[in-house]
Amino acid sequence: MDGAKFENTVAFLPSEIFDCYNSTLPKNVFRSFVTWSCYEKFNSLEFRTWLLMWLPLIIAWKIRGKRHYLVIVTALMFEVLYFLWTYSYIFRERTLGKQVSQFAKEIITNTPGIDTEDWERVAVNFNSYLYENKLWNTEYFFFDGSSCQEAFRKMLLEPFSLKKNDFANAKVPDGSVCYTEKALQVYFTQIERKWHWINSEGFLHNKTTQSVQFSKHGYGSKLLWAFKEVTIMNSRFAFFSIAYLNGLLTIPRLRNSLHILYVCAVLSSMIIEYLIGIDKFRFKSMNLIHKLQFLSYITCGHEKSDATNWSQIAKRTNTYMFEQKIWNSPILFSDGIDCEKFFKWYFSTPVSSQASLSVGSTDFELWPYIKEAQSACNDV
């Protein structure tokens, strides 16, 4: 498509006739995601068909008058409901897949970036477009900006990143490749601006990190640090411990070696479970902005050769995550070694090997900055 023709096409988008301020995101209308999801399902054609199916079955039950018949039919109908509920998610993806071009146009027009709030305008406009053109039965297709951003990453960003050299063969409908590439270009440009803003001298505040103590300084050992983290983050551990201690004080027969051994085994399994999954939990607690900030600390922290680089990075990240109220404890990393291992496993390894790991491999937009952080580490 000619460049001038493409720009003219983008300039007159059909969705511009909708005033985004006249539409409201579902997150501001419904009490929760669950109520919105139920509303969407109840207004679907599949659910209404399921309700109509009950009428002949109830009539047949009245004629037969057998109780076991009603039980069998009820169980069967709920199986059908489960199937229709699952199919609704597939139908939603198909609807979005058919409107990839319009979705890309909204991204080009509104230029969203890495912030979730930037995607709310895209969600509002796209919801209105689908409803006004009778492509969706409600005006609440996207729940919020986060769900809209996630759909973009799944429908456009991921296929592009996995098939970068042959994007035309990715799961993108014919005729929409031009809009899709332009939308991705807009998105990457906004992320690049965010990266430069984070790295600017005005944003990188120089906090005093000497007062921030690691586990071996503040708690005596990493074991005590791990125990404290488990108590704070794992509610099951705290609940079980309090419940057993209460029972131990009020019920004398629990004070025997068998019960104590059992409780110790349960508590130990909880600690081991948490310690195994602590890195994954730490990674999932970070959104894209937090990860970008972490990479910025690494890139700027390795500008000069210093044996305490990772310790300073860990302290700054601990302070940042605690101030952002992302981590309940002021200690996210126990020391510099812990911080370095976290970076290598969840950031460096997926990019270097391009492996399909369960976490870390889906943040495709962060790959250039991960490589920049790797380069900074290797230059030391």
Curated annotation (Swiss-Prot):
**GO BP terms in the entry:** protein transport to vacuole involved in ubiquitin-dependent protein catabolic process via the multivesicular body sorting pathway
Q: Which UniProt keywords apply?
A: Membrane, Transmembrane, Transmembrane helix
Q: This protein's superkingdom?
A: Eukaryota
Record-given protein name: Protein COS12
Q: Which cysteines are joined by disulfide bonds?
A: none
Ranges facing Extracellular side = 92-231, 279-380
Q: How does it sit in the membrane?
A: Multi-pass membrane protein
What GO terms fall under cellular component here?
endosome; fungal-type vacuole; membrane
Q: Which InterPro entries match?
A: DUP/COS (IPR001142)
Q: Where in the cell is it found?
A: Membrane
User: Into which family does the record put it?
Assistant: Belongs to the DUP/COS family.
Organism name: Saccharomyces cerevisiae (strain ATCC 204508 / S288c)
Q: Which residues lie on this side of the membrane: Cytoplasmic?
A: 1-70, 253-257
Q: Locate the transmembrane regions by residue number.
A: 71-91, 232-252, 258-278
